[in-house]
Amino acid sequence: MNALPSTIVAIATAAGTGGIGIVRLSGPQSVQIAAALGIAGLQSRHARYARFRDAQGEVIDDGIAVWFPAPHSFTGEEVVELQGHGSPVLLRQLVARCIALGARQARAGEFSERAFLNGKLDLAQAEAIADLIAAGDLRAARAARRSLDGVFSRRVDAVSESLTRLRIHVEAAIDFADEPLDTLGGAQVREELTRTRALLAQLLRDAERGRKLRDGLHAVLIGPPNAGKSSLLNALAGSDRAIVTDVAGTTRDTLHEAIQLDGFELTLVDTAGLREGGDAIEREGMRRARAELQRADLALIVLDARDPQAARDALGDAIDAVPRRLWIHNKCDLLAVAGPMDADAIAVSAVTGQGLEHLHTRLRELALGDGIESVDGEFSARTRHVDALHRAEQHADAADLELRYEQLELAAEELRLAHEALGEITGKLSADDLLGKIFSSFCIGK
């Protein structure tokens, strides 16, 4: 366990008033500070009623104190939690008193950082705490809970252990360079690498799914002016979030709205209509629309059902950047007779609601790419995890190629780089600046 001499303190409950507020202490002076507050006779993991007093002996608040001795606490250090009334004034006074007694104000995420540094959890698990708190729906919360329980980390460790075995074999073969690789178990090494690459590819697919569970799907409504994009956003959101008029080009800026699809969060982005010309403000809106497309998981291409082909032509190559697209023929209620429909398009009316149920179904199907049903063991992941897995996969693929040509030194280097990429996920090979960025994004008191 790493020795961290300072004792830190922070409010651990959410900002604002509430029935209960918690102040958390962690560090070697936690019990002594609690005693100076007037809390005597603390027993391990026993709740004790006490009055919390200031320097003059006046009662700041009363409540429950709980002591978690090291190393059997969240941070691995001496921890005392003071549970009083949820008054911000009283909680701040209690923190100030703890600081006067020798503690210091905790940095954002410092409790979780200490838990990581003391080996109570790895980096992916620490991040899962923040993801669990910020989860926008039940499914994302359950996925974050699994990551906190170590589901993701154990799978990363399994691939990492396989890479370790491979590196040992390849490094040993380098030491016997005069011997052909096959006489040194080269066939078994290649088989092991094939299995490892398969495990890594599956882990990457599952992490992509976990990233979408955490972040939700980013769907951009794109199309020519006056196709009904804003009306469709309002219809899907169930409220008048966007301004709607008969004037083409009403939408000048992007508008984000999160909706729930069977427990999955989908962020809809309304954008300015794409067309040639327009004034300076409209052109800036179109530039932002194209920028949103670059970040989109899904493009919802909204066309006027009365002349969809002309609307398609007007878009040009703007949608080429998005691999996943859903074509929507809006205003189908204005058709005197049903016109020709593209096989991949959905006919809807944002005004009457016609076709919206079908659209919801297709959005649910597209939400996770390979089905909408919850998968056993699905976990939460972040973009940085997915990026690290991509790099690990690329290096493992390169190692396989080098082994085929018996370029052992190059194969060993590629395996090392793959191993390092995986280590970034759990924090076993992470630079200090990366750790600082990650934990600084946490809440104070976590």
Swiss-Prot record:
UniProt keyword annotation of Transferase present: no
Main enzyme class: hydrolase
TrmE-type G domain: residues covered: 216-368
Primary location: cytoplasm
Positions contributing to (6S)-5-formyl-5,6,7,8-tetrahydrofolate binding: 24, 81, 120, 446
Cofactor comment: Binds 1 potassium ion per subunit.
Residues making up the signal peptide according to the UniProt record: none
Keyword terms: Cytoplasm, GTP-binding, Hydrolase, Magnesium, Metal-binding, Nucleotide-binding, Potassium, tRNA processing
Binding positions (Mg(2+)): 230, 251
Binding site for K(+): 226, 245, 247, 250
Cofactor: K(+)
One matching Pfam family: TrmE_N
Similarity comment text for this entry: Belongs to the TRAFAC class TrmE-Era-EngA-EngB-Septin-like GTPase superfamily. TrmE GTPase family.
Function: Exhibits a very high intrinsic GTPase hydrolysis rate. Involved in the addition of a carboxymethylaminomethyl (cmnm) group at the wobble position (U34) of certain tRNAs, forming tRNA-cmnm(5)s(2)U34.
Protein name per its UniProtKB record: tRNA modification GTPase MnmE
Species of provenance: Xanthomonas campestris pv. campestris (strain ATCC 33913 / DSM 3586 / NCPPB 528 / LMG 568 / P 25)
Highest classification ranks of the organism: Bacteria, Pseudomonadati, Pseudomonadota, Gammaproteobacteria, Lysobacterales
